Amino acid sequence: MTKKLTSRLSKIANSKILIFSIYINIVACIIAALSLLYYWYRVINKNLSLWLMLLLLVIAGLAMYSIFINIKLMATAIEEILTENIDLEKYLDIYTLMYKKANRYSKEEQEASLIFTDGRVKYYRGQFQDVQLTFDALDYNKVQKKYRTKLLLRRYNFEMLSCILQKEREEYNRLKSEIETLSPSLPSDQELRDNILKITSVAYSIIVEKQPNNYFDDHSVNSRLGKITYTYYAALNAQLKGEEARTRELFESIAQENPELFYVREAKRYLKGEQ
């Protein structure tokens, strides 16, 4: 049910997504505030049963919890604009809209999110030379401490992949050395770093060293964008192994996707050249 809801939300206009999120939060805050105010008023008047007291507290708690769920729901819906709908323009636009509408307390953090999103979109569009320049504008002091490490790791991921696709060995090795020295405190961040190192290492092997590696054939991901990514690298791997029929089959499977993705343009270029 949650998956269907986030999928539907990701397909509506960006302004409506934000309005829906704000509306839900406002309603939940009002319910929580009224419940707590009534609870306080009746306690002062000493005319409230224990069960009613508990009920009001539960209502207030559920209202506050719904705000938390709504935030997570909106974050998932926004991410699906990119990973499932493959709508790069809309994805960048909603972060631009959130930045413009942010209040003075969240303006700086929304600016950092917008810069990172811009760099991410440029990567998927194949604008590899602009990726690092965009990320260089990031000010990590504007990001909440608990998110800084994850954001830094994800930046390394896109920068390293950009270097690989441009065959910039020296810069790739420099970035790899830097990320290897990081010691994330959270297990989830450690797992993310290890996964980035693994995937970039395999991509480097296939694209730069021209050495076949079956990682992308043997592993899978759930998102539509992730599947396109893995299929692209699996096709390059098949090409290295001289498996032209499989290479063609894999490239054909992604050639009808959004041509904004460099994966798709490269697939079409291969298929056109083959003809």
Locate the predicted segments by residue.
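Long, non-transmembrane cytosolic or organellar matrix-exposed soluble domains/tails
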Residues: 213-275
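A membrane-cytosol interface segment of integral membrane proteins
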Residues: 132-142, 146-169
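N-terminal alpha-helical membrane-insertion module
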Residues: 1-92, 98
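Hydrophobic/aromatic side-chain positions at a characteristic register within alpha-helices
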Residues: 81-86, 123, 164-167, 205-207, ...
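Residue signature of alpha-solenoid helical repeat architecture, marking inter-repeat boundaries
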Residues: 68, 72, 105-111, 146-153, ...
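N-terminal topogenic membrane-targeting module
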Residues: 60-143
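"A position-specific structural signal for the A-helix of alpha-solenoid helical repeats
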Residues: 76-77, 110-120, 151-161, 192-204, ...
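Alpha-helical repeat scaffolds
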Residues: 90-100, 128-140, 167-184, 208-223, ...
